Amino acid sequence: MAELTISANDIQSAIEEYVGSFTSDTSREEVGTVVDAGDGIAHVEGLPSVMTQELLEFPGGVLGVALNLDEHSVGAVILGNSENIEEGQQVKRTGEVLSVPVGDAFLGRVINPLGQPIDGRGDIKAETRRALELQAPSVVQRQSVKEPLQTGIKAIDAMTPIGRGQRQLIIGDRKTGKTAVCVDTILNQRQNWETGDPKKQVRCVYVAVGQKGTTIASVRRALEEGGAMDYTTIVAAPASDSAGFKWLAPYTGSAVAQHWMYDGKHVLIVFDDLTKQAEAYRAISLLLRRPPGREAYPGDVFYLHSRLLERCAKLSDELGGGSLTGLPIIETKANDISAYIPTNVISITDGQCFLETDLFNQGVRPAINVGVSVSRVGGAAQIKAIKEVAGSLRLDLSQYRELEAFAAFASDLDATSKAQLDRGARLVELLKQPQYQPMPVEEQVISIFLGTGGHLDSVPVEDVRRFETELLDHIRASEENLLSTIRDTQKLTEETEEALTKVINHFKKGFASSTGESVVPDEHVEAMDEEDLGKESVKVKKPAPQKKK
């Protein structure tokens, strides 16, 4: 039988190998205990080194955010289902602040405020992650707004223009078409996207906060049918989500958009709507026992929106020249724009489009109130062609509204007032636009030129929209060079204006009104003097005097 021999060296090497490969499963981590939980809020004892807005891990993989850092406990907002969180459960620190995955893979997808896909189309491979709470670009990192962002809506592009990097508030009562205005703006970016030019392309982010699930689905369907989901990301926090998700959703959308902005690209973000975010934040703050202020909102509700909207900017050329344009939506009650949240957001943004219930019910859609709507910086970004034709549009409409109220009581109006009323009625009709049908800027120029140039004065009010539609169809079919000239030069030169007037006058000859009458204006005839009215004039032909013989 062979003798088994083990040397001391073998034993030593085996022990060294075992010790070298040994790993300890123990780790040092802070663990807290749930003291109480309910209504999407949990109070946790322990965790002395936790950071503000740090992610906490609850049992079952549920995440929370540390908001209140008290002396002996932490107030956390639970992100997700909080029904299974009970007193006495352990809570772990993650050591990470809130962040979301970002990148081009998110285009065409629907995600929740944690960046997780919820459209059933599989996982998303992100390029990198971005923190939700980031400092907005400083004054030095910005430049003035100078490039237009066309909405495709005549009333906005002509009178309250929006530039890339601007924040334009869309404000109004419920059911006045606020979402439709923003969806139209997203749809209007398709033409730029199809050019493939990075300087023209605009990526879009639609943030739905507290909306019904059916509303979000209908918006997504409208974007898909319009071919806009190719360049759009939807961040959804529907009404069924917890208050924590509704509070975070706008910051998630901003993080996704800022990634592209700092990459030198142009982005449009829609917050629909910030009123519901403020209400969710109010609920969180009251449950965390923070002292309430005006309308029971916490003292930092202004900062909630200002730090969000200040991220919209036009970056300097040194940082790539990217831009982030914001369209926040605020819902008012009974057209009261002097309430707390509306006045806050009006003071933060660079202008507002005020949508009015009365105008909407009268059939004026989009129901934009010209008198209250304003754009503080977009005028510098407006193209020259629009600026030339729309120069008098706001004044004409304002005078029309004043005269309209006066004419309701006055029976006898002078000729000038009647002419202003007639022109104003046609302009109002001209600015009406169907939903989900944005108009290219060159066609807007022609449309507004019709109204401000007086070419519609002889067209009956009920035929104005049909005249506009048929004229644009005619120009697309046989005068395409006119559209391309305006599109390329972005100006309305004298030659183009003459050619356009010639086309309009020629088209009028073949256009019949709904009553069958011609819309060609009668030739101008000089009026008789007042003293000559009612007098008969008789021409007597006198024979020529005969010469004396």
From Swiss-Prot:
F-type ATPases have 2 components, CF(1) - the catalytic core - and CF(0) - the membrane proton channel. CF(1) has five subunits: alpha(3), beta(3), gamma(1), delta(1), epsilon(1). CF(0) has three main subunits: a(1), b(2) and c(9-12). The alpha and beta chains form an alternating ring which encloses part of the gamma chain. CF(1) is attached to CF(0) by a central stalk formed by the gamma and epsilon chains, while a peripheral stalk is formed by the delta and b chains. ATP binds at G172, D173, R174, K175, T176, G177, K178, T179. GO terms for cellular component: plasma membrane; proton-transporting ATP synthase complex. It comes from Mycobacterium ulcerans (strain Agy99). This is ATP synthase subunit alpha. It is a peripheral membrane protein. Produces ATP from ADP in the presence of a proton gradient across the membrane. The alpha chain is a regulatory subunit. InterPro entries: ATP_synth_asu-like_sf, ATP_synth_asu_C, ATP_synth_asu_C_sf, ATP_synth_F1_a_nt-bd_dom, ATP_synth_F1_asu, ATPase_a/bsu_AS, ATPase_F1/V1/A1_a/bsu_N, ATPase_F1/V1/A1_a/bsu_N_sf. It is found in: Cell membrane. It catalyses: ATP + H2O + 4 H(+)(in) = ADP + phosphate + 5 H(+)(out). Residues 513-549 are annotated as: Disordered. GO terms for molecular function: ADP binding; ATP binding; proton-transporting ATP synthase activity, rotational mechanism. PROSITE patterns: ATPASE_ALPHA_BETA. It is an enzyme of class 7 (translocase). SUPFAM superfamilies: C-terminal domain of alpha and beta subunits of F1 ATP synthase, N-terminal domain of alpha and beta subunits of F1 ATP synthase, P-loop containing nucleoside triphosphate hydrolases. Belongs to the ATPase alpha/beta chains family. Residues 540-549 have a biased composition (Basic residues). HAMAP family: ATP_synth_alpha_bact (MF_01346). Keywords: ATP synthesis, ATP-binding, Cell membrane, CF(1), Hydrogen ion transport, Ion transport, Membrane, Nucleotide-binding, Translocase, Transport. Its EC number is 7.1.2.2. The record marks S373 as: Required for activity.
